[in-house]
Amino acid sequence: MDEWLDIYDEHQRPTGRLRRRGDPIEPGERYLVVTVFVRDSGGRFLTTRRSPQKAYYPGCWEVTSGTAQAKEDGSAAAVRELAEETGLAPGPAAFHYLGRLEHPTDGQGGIFILDHFLVQLPSAAPAIRMQPEEVADWRWRTPDEVEQLCR
């Protein structure tokens, strides 16, 4: 089944145009991506290793992230992506909006609009149910360990 993405303008507003996921993006086009930082009650963050079958950054460690589908805002995309990739479903009220950035896509001329969220879990290290097409492994890490991954 095809996934469709909303295209945004330079003011980060939907244009009404759609693009099929995986189709080339035009220079200057923007689409919405979310990242979800999940912290357990011990202060550790959930990191996941991308599946080796992923087209971009296979096998790399990351926090939960994904592309918003057409007609989906950042909050809804964050809730969906976290549930799909990890099995965690703390409910929309647990998602705290951290802010928005823009970042160029890798060599495509387009631009990611990145909405960042934090989820604070009430317990330490709950069980994770990985989505094998997306996630190959997972690990809870201290803030210092996460910082080391980013270097």
Residue ranges, per PLM feature:
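Acidic, metal-coordinating catalytic segment for phosphate/diphosphate chemistry
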Residues: M1-T35, S41
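A generic fold-level signal
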Residues: Y31, D40, A55-Y56, G109-F112, ...
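A short, polar/proline- and glycine-enriched secondary-structure boundary/capping micro-motif
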Residues: E26-G28, Y56-E62, R139-W140
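Unchanged
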Residues: G66-R151
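A glycine-rich, hydrophobic loop/mini-helix early in the fold
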Residues: V33-S65
